[in-house]
UniProtKB/Swiss-Prot annotation:
MF term (GO), any: cobalt-precorrin-5B C1-methyltransferase activity
The protein's name in its UniProt record: Cobalt-precorrin-5B C(1)-methyltransferase
Organism: Klebsiella pneumoniae subsp. pneumoniae (strain ATCC 700721 / MGH 78578)
Family designation: Belongs to the CbiD family.
Top EC category: transferase
Gene Ontology biological process terms from the UniProt entry: anaerobic cobalamin biosynthetic process; methylation
Swiss-Prot/TrEMBL catalytic activity: Co-precorrin-5B + S-adenosyl-L-methionine = Co-precorrin-6A + S-adenosyl-L-homocysteine
Pathway, per record: Cofactor biosynthesis; adenosylcobalamin biosynthesis; cob(II)yrinate a,c-diamide from sirohydrochlorin (anaerobic route): step 6/10
Entry EC number(s): 2.1.1.195
Keyword entries, A-Z: Cobalamin biosynthesis, Methyltransferase, S-adenosyl-L-methionine, Transferase
InterPro entries recorded: CbiD, CbiD_sf
């Protein structure tokens, strides 16, 4: 995404909608400017960062303060016209220099704490996701140089109150908000406009002559395909939660092969015949896992443990501990079966494959041998 693309509005029903930036971008900018102030020993009132999507943001700094080896600064969250629970709040960073040579990151007031497994962060750690952790540490390192150390604290005085309007508590994130954002940019878009934009990408791929397409829920899937399967990123299209819609569009456009690749947290819903995977439509993840574990002869204690889990990752720990890893191949096959059932009235349906991977990019299961799927996609 270029800077010009960021400045351009998103149009919906004739109305121009303004883009915004994530809590991760706010935390990164606040940490960067605090580090610069403590190095230069004077106040700074504007800072620029480059987001993971390549957009340069120039942001106003609020409440800057520097004293000795410590500085504090804040950035106000702006979600554009996609107003959420964190819109308008201040995200602070406090940077304290030291001689350790290392950069340590911690969450302070108003930043949630991870209390359950299953969201890709260690239990007891602050709810600062992987991409913001990386961008914060990189920005501070650039500011302080290669040899100094720093302690970075991210905090949000309104965080406890704002978090009550989010799903954090249901995910086991307690005491505040999460610092998130894979791209650093918030793009406002209605569901229909969003679906149409995804379909347009399919049309572009097909017009370029592609007959095989990989559908992924989001950025994590794109990285897995690129890094673990060696597949050309040009073959990958994001389907978001709109699995059924994107499959139907791929059929309409004449793709001969569809490969669904993603984390079980999204894709196992398809095994239950759920083709819109947003949680406000349907969930049934634990019910699906329990049903298919039972089909494989899993004992009641394991079924009970899985049924009581809040996240797929937590359930997977029990599944792996009990030695039922074969469930993942079984689910991948079931996903393909469900897709073909959905397309049963299509005259020449495409072939379908499914691949499931973990948060740490390990292959969990596939409908066919992974090498065979990858080979077909690269030929």
């Amino acid at each position: 995404m270029s800077d010009q693309t960021f400045d351009a509005p998103v149009w919906h029903h004739g109305k121009a909608l303004r883009k915004g930036y994530t809590t991760g971008s706010c935390a990164t900018a606040a940490a960067k400017v605090a580090a610069l102030m403590v190095m230069r020993q004077h106040l700074i009132h504007q800072v620029s960062i480059v987001t993971p999507s390549g957009v340069t943001l120039c942001l106003n700094v609020e409440s800057p303060h520097v004293e000795g080896q410590q500085a504090v600064a804040a950035i106000r969250k702006d979600g554009g016209d996609d107003v959420d629970a964190t819109h308008g709040m201040l995200i602070f960073a406090r940077v304290t220099l030291n001689d350790s040579g290392e950069i340590s990151l911690q969450g302070g007031e108003g930043i949630g704490t991870v209390t359950r497994k299953g969201i890709g962060l260690p239990t007891g750690s602050p709810a600062i996701n992987r991409t913001p952790r990386h961008t914060i540490e990189t920005a501070v390192r650039e500011a302080i140089g290669p040899t100094r150390g720093a302690q970075v604290e991210i905090f949000a005085p309104e965080g406890v109150l704002r978090a009550q309007k989010t799903y954090n508590a249901r995910l086991g994130i307690l005491g505040g908000i999460s610092i998130i954002g894979t791209t650093g940019i918030v793009t406002p878009m209605s569901e229909e406009s969003w679906k149409r934009s995804l379909s347009l990408e399919l049309e572009i791929k097909r017009a370029a002559g592609l007959e095989r397409v990989v559908l992924v829920p989001g950025n994590h899937g794109e990285r897995f395909v690129r890094e673990q399967m060696g597949i050309d990123p040009q073959m990958v299209v994001t389907m978001s939660n709109f699995v059924g819609y994107m499959i139907e569009e791929a059929v309409r456009l004449g793709f001969r092969q569809i490969v669904l690749i993603g984390h079980p947290g999204k894709l196992i819903k398809i095994a239950a015949g759920i083709f819109h995977t947003h949680s406000h439509i349907a969930d049934a993840r634990m019910e699906t896992l329990v049903a298919h574990l039972a089909l494989l002869g899993a004992p009641l204690p394991l079924l009970t443990l899985v049924s009581e889990c809040d996240t797929t990752e937590a359930a997977m720990e029990h599944i792996d501990a009990w030695g039922y890893q074969r469930l993942y191949n079984h689910l991948a096959e079931r996903i393909c079966q469900r897709v073909l059932e959905m397309l049963r009235f299509t005259q020449q349906p495409p072939t379908c494959d499914a691949v499931l991977f973990s948060f740490d990019n390990q292959v969990l299961g596939s409908s066919r041998p992974l090498a065979a799927i990858a080979r077909e996609l690269t030929c």
